[in-house]
Curated annotation (Swiss-Prot):
It comes from Culex quinquefasciatus (Southern house mosquito). Residues 20-38 have a biased composition (Low complexity). Its EC number is 4.1.1.130. It catalyses: a 4-hydroxy-3-methoxy-5-(all-trans-polyprenyl)benzoate + H(+) = a 2-methoxy-6-(all-trans-polyprenyl)phenol + CO2. Zn(2+) binds at residues 177-178, 181, 193. Residues 1-10 have a biased composition (Basic residues). This is Ubiquinone biosynthesis protein COQ4 homolog 1, mitochondrial. Pathway: Cofactor biosynthesis; ubiquinone biosynthesis. The keyword Zinc applies. Lyase that catalyzes the C1-decarboxylation of 4-hydroxy-3-methoxy-5-(all-trans-polyprenyl)benzoic acid into 2-methoxy-6-(all-trans-polyprenyl)phenol during ubiquinone biosynthesis. GO terms for biological process: ubiquinone biosynthetic process. Its main location: mitochondrion. Residues 1-44 are annotated as: Disordered.
Length: 268
């Protein structure tokens, strides 16, 4: 710090430095003025702390290599969920950023980004949902999980991303996937999974959804029934990432589908 001799002045609170003022030829005094402290940064939320613990930082070249390698592996074996997850993280940033902007433009979406809710057996009381009326969204979600013997705890953690908020958007996409299955009325077999992927592809723009939809279809009536329905739903359904699903558990399923503009697939 540099000190300089000046004439006595009235000191404000806008600076924090030591000023030496002249009292006499042989005497001086030093006055310290404290500036207001900057507000401390808020501590990271629980999701950000977890993400930073698991994050694997990669260079742009490594990201390209991971993207190409995971896409080839997913093409060879569409059931390699780890490769599909890696593909989404390494290629999905532009789409995730668009989803974030879309969420910020919606009251419900902004609330999701602020709260950062999680969907797993530690955060959702499955027994309470099961006790809801049979026509409720929450009850039918638990029925879907039990019928297909799956758990919301099986979703892969996001590792290869830089932005914690975009990492949350990706996590949210993964954790609501089974909720989308439920509200669309789609099973977890190949046809159901492919149909849901098409809806998600058109609804979110995530590139790995297009990949799963294109390369996963292996059954004949896919082109006849499932694909036309999925394409129509993908275009007409309201943005699914803007739905605060946890506040809809008690809502009647038929009412929720009508609100989201979802039509069930009917095969005669």
């Amino acid at each position: 710090m540099f000190l300089r001799r000046v004439h006595p002045v009235r000191l404000g609170h806008a600076s924090q430095r030591s000023l030496t003022t002249t009292k006499s030829r042989n005497e001086s005094t030093t006055t310290t003025v404290e500036a207001p402290q900057a507000a401390p940064s808020p501590p990271p939320d629980a999701f950000t702390e977890e993400f930073l613990r698991n994050q694997i930082k990669v260079t742009e070249l490594q990201r390209v290599i991971l993207g190409v390698g995971s896409s080839l592996a997913a093409l060879v074996n569409p059931r390699r969920h780890d490769m599909i997850a890696c593909l989404g993280e390494t290629t999905g940033v532009p789409a995730l950023d668009a989803i974030r902007r879309q969420m910020l433009a919606s009251d419900e979406g902004r609330q999701i980004l602020a709260d950062r809710p999680r969907i797993n057996t530690r955060t959702v009381d499955m027994a309470a949902l099961k006790a809801l009326p049979e026509t409720s969204f929450g009850h039918q979600y638990v029925h879907f999980l039990e019928k297909h013997d799956i758990t919301p705890d099986s979703r892969a953690e996001v590792r290869f991303m830089d932005d914690p908020e975009l990492a949350y958007v990706m996590t949210r996409y993964r954790e609501v996937h089974d909720l989308v299955h439920t509200v669309l009325g789609m099973p977890t077999n190949m046809l159901g999974e492919v149909a849901v992927k098409w809806v998600e592809a058109l609804n979110t723009g995530l590139p790995m959804c297009y990949g799963g939809a294109v390369f996963g279809a292996q059954r004949q009536n896919y082109l006849r029934h499932y694909l036309p329905w999925a394409l129509r739903m993908g275009r007409q359904v309201r943005p699914l990432m803007n739905v605060y699903w946890e506040k809809r558990w008690e809502q009647d399923m038929a009412e929720l589908r009508q609100e989201l503009n979802i039509e069930e697939l009917v095969i005669n």
